[in-house]
Each structure stands twice: as structure tokens, then as C-alpha cells.
Amino acid sequence: MKVINKILIAVLAFCMIFALVGCVDDDNTTDTVIDFDLVAMEPNSTYAMFQNLNKNTNEYLNKSFKIPGTYCLMSDGSHTVFFSDSCCSEYIEFKLKGVDAEYPELYENVVITGIGGQKTVDGQQHFYLYDAEIVE
């Protein structure tokens, strides 16, 4: 009976160790929840969302976004992602996370994620993304 108890304890210990190993996060990453995924939207819906972001900026502050587009550098030095469909075009300014952030090549198709913010330029408030990252 003592041998069976020892075997049972050993098996239980092994099972507990095996179960705990499965709880370890190998890559130490966390999945970021995206509040507004414009990649998943149809072009007309994406255009409408761009319009709404600039008209109702306060509703989108501190929300996370995933936005597709073409990287452009504006004449004032601001970095933008430019979206265009068959009839219309819009752009959103973004600032990459980190002081040594490396921006993509001009006119490269990208997908960026970032947090919605607001800035004032020439007395007008504009929506932009801060802490942005290029994900594709």
C-alpha cells in the first residue's frame, strides 16, 4: 500500500508540474485590443470613419486604432497615412512610439496601430495617432 501511495504522489506531482509549465508565457507579449479596426472595413466605411474622426474627435480620444494606407511625408514634416478609394481620399497624421523610431519608405503601403489624440494646428483641432507602430 505504501508503494502505491508513493507512486500516486509522484504521478500527482508530475501532473501538477506539467500543468504549471503550460501556464508560462514564452514570448511575454500581450494581445492589444483594437477599438476601431479600419483594415476590416469596406472602403466607403473607412472613408466615412476618417471624416468622423476629424469632425467628432473627442469621441475617439484614447481609443486604439488599426489603419491601412500609404505612408506620406507632408510639406510641414508631419508623418501621415493616406487612404484613397475610387472617389475620395483622406489622411491621418501619426507619430511613431519612441524617439529613434524608423519611419517607412515614402509611398509604402502600411498598416499602423496607435492611440487617438488631438492636436491644434493653426487654431484648428485635428485628430492624430500617437504611440503608433507599423504592424504591416
Give the residues covered by each predicted segment.
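Bacterial N-terminal signal peptides that target proteins for export
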Residues: 1-10
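OB-fold and OB-like single-stranded nucleic-acid-recognition modules
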Residues: 19-136
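Bacterial N-terminal signal peptides
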Residues: 10-19
